[in-house]
Structures are given as structure tokens and as C-alpha cells.
Amino acid sequence: MHYLGRGPVVSVAVCNPCAQGVRYKNAMDPAANRLAPLLDRMVDYERLRPTEREWDLSGVERLLRRKHAAVPVRPAIQVAGSKGKGTTAAFLEAIGSAAGLRTGSYSSPHLITLCERIRIAGEPIRVECLQPVLAGLLDFAGDQPPTFFEAMTVAAVECFAQDQVDLAIYEVGLGGRFDATTAIDVDAAIVTRIELEHTDVLGDTIAAIAGEKAAVIRSGGLGLTATTGEALAVIRAHAERVGAELLVMGEDFGVHHIDWADDGARGLLSLPDGTRQQFFLPDAKAFELPALALAVAALSRLHSDLKLPLDPVPRPNLPCRFEVRTEADGGVLILDGAHTEDSLQAVVVEVQRRYPGTTPRVLTSLAAGKRWQEALSAVLPIADSFVVTELTGTPGEDPAKICAWLTEQGARSEVATDVASGLRKLREHPGPRLVVGSFYLAGAVRLLVDSHA
């Protein structure tokens, strides 16, 4: 395997798509069901989490450079980072759309339907549009089928070009250096925050992970970052090495004089051109402010003549990012895909700010190989009761193993056989009810709640 940041590429045998069996037929997602004959011809590393594969951009570059391939839309922005990249991409989409741009946004993972990954003007791509694009890519690839992520990435490029969007936004899936989105020409690359994540692939130090994500900043291009300390030093050194302009939050742009109220947050945004603008973000969460600053700074540089709507800021669609639902019994259900120590700490801060003095019950499941003990340790200061269930959509840690560890930490815990029973057990608690640990879990709970609304 090629461990990013740890050594040279080593050629290895990867799993043949046919050997994975039929994975999408009878899926809960109707779009995946319709696309199953195409999807089952691809390797899906999000589901397999294999220990061996070769990392490079040759496959996606081959698709992007094929004859009659679409010319990628410009301007385009790529968003990388351990924390906040999805929120930053969502702010780019929401503010750009409200300012009059027709946006195309590519993100992952999806919560309910894979069509969510490719959005045009805020709406998921229609399966009727996606199907012929994927079919064409697979026909071209022949006996060298792309991975699921590679195919969806190139499909996003094609769909944005066909629709003639004004702004393309690409969220990195994993890392940066060898992520499929890095094969696309962009006008700005954003690196949000860096933390220890995917250490088996990206490296086990902040410096190593920062080095992988810094690679999204192109030679002679524009980079923006909200990193600090060691991560910032690595990113700054990379930008200098490749001759890129780097804008740093807290130095070249930022958020100032924040005034919190029940209905949101008001303050000042400093922009790269030295100006300041007032903003009001309705229903603001603390973790959203760096994302807002990054998005506004990037848009102001790429569209200097565009009047950005900041008072109020248009709220982005952020499902399962501290999404609060009021249930039939009056209890509060909070859905969040946070699964790392830092992101869960941000959730804890928000719970304490909004619901002081309460003790939430937690429904969780975590992906295999994650630093799950460190992640759950962040939640223990506010919660002492947990329900642990199986993770669907990607390999997960054994719920019994997680429960045993929680018991050792002095918390009460029980295993639920599936997400539905886990939600029932969670609802036995008056609230708040907190769902964290995985976007797959949060999305599954969201689907259950919506289907019984």
C-alpha cells in the first residue's frame, strides 16, 4: 500500500469489483438501485476500507483527459481539511448562490442518496442526468474501471460543464495530494483545520497530515487556510516552495467582535483587500465562523466585483452538522456526523452553550480503524449514558467492544441491534438526545425520523 506521507508508491493487487458481489441492488437509496449495474462495476473504497491499494491520480486524469471530455468550469474552488471542509463548501455554495451565481458543488459522503454528492443550484443531480455520464465513463475505461469516488468526481466535472455553472466547488474526499479532486484545475484551494485522522493512510503526525493536505495548493495558485501552529508552518512552507499566494485566517482575513444572541451571531469579517464588512449569521454555531470567514475570503478574491450577502448571511444546508430536531414529545434530537476528537469537542461546546446544565444521552457508532477512544473521550465530560449500534455503509468498530470501553470509563452503555432500536432506546431519555460518531449513522437516523414525521 502507499501510505500517504510515508513513502513511495508500491504496486499491489486491489479487489476486483466483481469479487465484491452485488452491492447496490435493493439499496435503500432509489438512485443507487437504478444505477446498480453501473456502480457494481466500480471499486468502492468508502465501503470496503481495504488495507491495500495504490494511490495516484492516473486513473482520474485519464478520464478527465479523454477525447471529448468536458472542460472543467472556472472559476473553481477546492476545499480540503480535517475539520470544517463540508461546512466551508456549504457556505461557498449558499453565499455564491444568493449573490447570483449558479453553483455546482461536489461533496461526500452522502446521507440519503448518492445524488446529493453532485448539486447544481443547491439541488441534487437527477439520476436521469447522472446515469448516461457514468455509463460513458465506464465504457471509456473498459477493463480498467474507475473507483466509485473517481467516477463521481469526473461526473461532477461533466455535469457542471453541461449545465454551465458559474462556480464549481469540490470538497476533498480524503487527504489531498492523491484525492481525485486534486486532478481538477482550480483557482483557489482551501485548507480548513488539521487534526489527527485517517492516520493509517495520511500519517500519524499533524505535520504529515498537513503535508498531504497542503498539496492541494497548486504551483503559482491561491491558497487559503485556517490552520495554526505546526500545521500552518507546513502549509506555509509548501506555498513558498511552489510559489503560491497563501492567505491565512487571523493574518489576512478573519472574524472579529462576535456578539452572540439567541437568534444568531453578529460581528465583523475582515477581507483580504483590507476592508471589513458587518455580518449576521442566523442560528449560528461557533464552529461555523471559521468556515464562513474562509468562504467569504475566497469568494471576495475570485469575484471582487460581486456583492456578497452578509447581513444576513444565507444559511447553508448543513444536514447532520449540529442539526437540531424537536420531537413529538418535546425532546431535543441533535444529529451530527462528528467522528474525531476535535469535531466532537466542538459539538460538546455547542451543547453546553445551548443546553447548559443538561446531560444528553448519546447514540453512536464509529468506523473501524478510527481513533474512537480519543473521539468518545471528548463526549464523556457531558454524557454518562450511551447506546452503541452497528455502523451501516462502511466497516465499523464492534459495538460490544465500544460498550466495554465506555463501562471502563464509568459510563452506562448498551448495544442496540440496529439503528431503529438504537433510536428507540435513545428516546427513552427526556433529552437532549445526541447522535454522533458517523455521518452514516446520523444520515440513517435522519432518514428514520423523516420517514415517520
Task: Locate the predicted segments by residue.
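Beta-strand->loop->alpha-helix junctions that form or flank phosphate-binding loops
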Residues: 106, 225-227, 240-260, 280-286, ...
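Nucleotide phosphate-binding/pyrophosphate-handling subdomain across enzymes
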Residues: 75, 162, 167-170, 179-190, ...
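C-terminal helical cap/extension that packs against the catalytic core
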Residues: 228-238, 243, 263, 300-301, ...
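ATP-dependent carboxylate-amine ligase catalytic core
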Residues: 51-76, 97-184, 200-202, 208, ...
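Acidic, Mg2+-coordinating active-site environments of NTP-dependent enzymes
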Residues: 144, 151, 164-171, 186-279, ...
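A glycine-rich beta-strand to alpha-helix segment
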Residues: 421-450
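Short functional linear segments
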Residues: 15-17, 23-81, 88-99, 106
